[in-house]
Regions:
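Flexible loop/N-cap segments at domain edges
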Residues: 167-389, 393, 398, 411-413, ...
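Two-component/phosphorelay signaling modules centered on CheY-like receiver
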Residues: 1-20, 25
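C-terminal output helix
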Residues: 5, 80, 98-107
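Alpha4 helix (beta4-alpha4-beta5 surface) of REC/receiver domains from two-component response regulators
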Residues: 52-53, 66, 76-92, 105
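Conserved phosphotransfer microenvironments
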Residues: 42-59, 66, 478, 482-485
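CheY-like receiver
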Residues: 111-165
Length: 533
């Protein structure tokens, strides 16, 4: 009823073409057919994904243009909700209850600004960002309207980031923050500029400041966790994610936390987290289906780590979850996604004939519009089925997509999955084994410094291989090194203590840990285990 009333009011304001949608699926279907000039989006969409999730999806799919104005409407004043809305850069935010006059003012203002900036926005839509910047600078010289100038400066920083001119973007954000250090979008822009420019320490310092306020804590912790993952510091990443209450974890944040658990061989905790999240979203079918597939991946991963005669229970649960996802939805992409997971399950069951039958189904080669997790499933399936050429072909497409993806939880998760595929089919493993072999030879000769160097190179190529990690820690301890390159000894020990190890590896880690404790004069200065830089 609220949508119909709003539509009627817009028609009364002389808007001729006004279309209503009840959920994101309806909007996506419409956007595939025609463009929209202005989108008024409510945050709460009933038993469907919320407005922010919908906007993120259509932006990622390229269904919404830079020239489309977005106005968010919500009755929710919670910092967590407002923060999520601000993150998608709407042109305006209207808090309910609203008046028709306030709607009219906001819509008119957004469309006026859109018309003013259209020459720039059209060039951005055509991916002509260099030309868009030239046009923007010309308009900035001519404009005398402070409000429009402010929007132009904000857009200029975004274009500079798109062009990889991070230092120039940083200067803009710093100038804005000098005027007021409470402009949140400028803080996020500065953090992004620093991060993309490789200034990790600067971005981390700003992010730590952002954890002090409720409005920005969750996003800052997620970002800090991603930075930690980039440095293979999964224990540290987990600590940041623990600062977000489970009930306030977004869908992508829950996925990120689950993959952090899996990276530490703690699959049971990943399953427990995703099961809770899935159950709490039972009433929101789209999220429920996605979480069912995420959970199925966890069970497939757990089954892969077991002996072939111990996989049945995990595989049965995985297949049930795959089948339950989108049961009533006719979506070709979802069908392909599920079929690749079914193929993996068949391969883990040892039924290669069934797997090949699934892989031969129509549409299984059509991965252009597939998401990265589906593509990594496809790589694993083709590789395990014996078609390494096909697996490498998809891996290359995957790497290109990953390079072009925006920095986000999803990109970090996908990078972890792609890295796993690279380890399986790439050239890294033989090289890592060669470094490890040389390291062992030097270690036997008590050349601990050079042994540590070799173990470190093997670790960089295969950071999740526990043998390489233990060898590196052993080398550092015997070389009496507090820190080697990016690895801090005590922080690294803490990381390894979080992982689920075999009895043999656990015994070895205990011996190394005892040796560190016996050498307090060397390692005692860093009892707080500061993070690697």
């Amino acid at each position: 009823m609220a949508r119909i009333n709003l539509r009627n009011h817009l028609l009364e304001m002389d808007f001729e073409d006004v279309v209503c949608f009840s959920n994101g699926r309806e909007l996506r279907a419409h956007l595939k057919l025609r463009d929209i000039d202005l989108l008024l989006m409510d945050f709460h969409l009933g038993q469907h994904k919320n407005g922010v999730e919908v906007i993120e999806e259509v932006q990622k799919a390229g269904l919404i243009k830079n020239s489309t104005s977005i106005i968010f409407i919500t009755s929710d004043r919670l910092p967590m909700i407002v923060g999520q809305i601000v993150d998608v850069h709407p042109d305006a935010l209207i808090i309910k209850p609203y008046t028709i006059n306030s709607i009219k003012q906001n819509v008119t203002r957004c469309l006026d600004l859109r018309h003013f900036m259209m020459p720039i926005l059209k060039q951005m839509d055509e991916d002509k960002h260099e030309q868009a910047l030239i046009t923007l600078d010309e308009m900035l010289k001519e404009s005398e309207n402070p409000r429009k100038n402010s929007s132009l400066v904000k857009l200029r920083a975004r274009i500079l980031i798109k062009l990889g001119r991070y230092d120039e973007a940083s200067k803009i954000y710093k100038t804005i923050l000098k005027g007021s250090d409470k402009i949140i979008w400028a803080k996020w822009g500065l953090i992004q500029s620093y991060h993309l420019n490789g200034q990790v320490e600067e971005s981390e310092a700003l992010l730590l400041d952002m954890t002090d306020t409720q409005l920005t804590n969750d996003k800052a912790c997620e970002w800090l966790a991603r930075i930690s993952i980039d440095g293979n510091q999964y224990g540290k990443a987990e600590e940041y994610m623990e600062k977000i209450r489970d009930g306030e974890l977004s869908l992508n944040a829950a996925r990120l936390k689950a993959y952090i658990y899996q990276a530490q061989e703690r699959g049971s905790e990943a399953i427990e987290l995703l099961e809770k999240k899935r159950e709490s979203n039972r009433g929101i079918r789209e999220r429920f289906d996605e979480l069912s597939l995420d959970l199925a991946r966890c069970y497939l991963n757990e089954a892969e780590g077991k002996a072939s005669n111990e996989r049945d229970d995990k595989l049965q649960v995985a297949k049930f979850l795959i089948g339950s996802a989108g049961r009533k939805v006719a979506d070709p992409q979802l069908t392909v996604k599920k079929d690749y997971m079914y193929a993996l399950a068949a391969l883990l069951e040892g039924d290669k004939k069934k797997a090949n039958e699934i892989l031969a189904r129509p549409g299984m080669d059509e991965l252009e519009g597939a998401d990265l997790p589906t593509m990594t499933d496809a790589i694993s399936a083709w590789q395990t089925a014996g078609n390494k050429v096909k697996a490498i072909e998809i891996l290359k497409i995957c790497q290109q997509k990953l390079a072009a993806a925006n920095d986000s939880n999803e990109k970090t998760i996908s990078a972890m999955l792609v890295a796993k595929n690279e380890e399986t089919i790439g050239e890294k493993k033989p090289q890592a084994l060669a470094y490890n072999k040389e390291g062992l030879e030097r270690f036997v000769k008590k050349d601990y410094q050079q042994a540590t160097h070799c173990f470190y190179q093997a670790y960089l190529l295969f950071p999740r291989e526990i043998a390489f990690s233990l060898n590196l820690l052993q080398g550092m301890v015997d070389a009496e090194v507090v820190k080697y390159e990016t690895i801090d000894t005590l922080r690294f020990l803490k990381e390894l203590e979080r992982r689920q190890l075999t009895p043999g590896n656990q015994k070895r880690l205990d011996v190394i840990s005892a040796k560190i404790s016996d050498n307090q004069e060397i390692f005692g200065e860093q009892t707080d285990a500061p993070s690697a830089e």
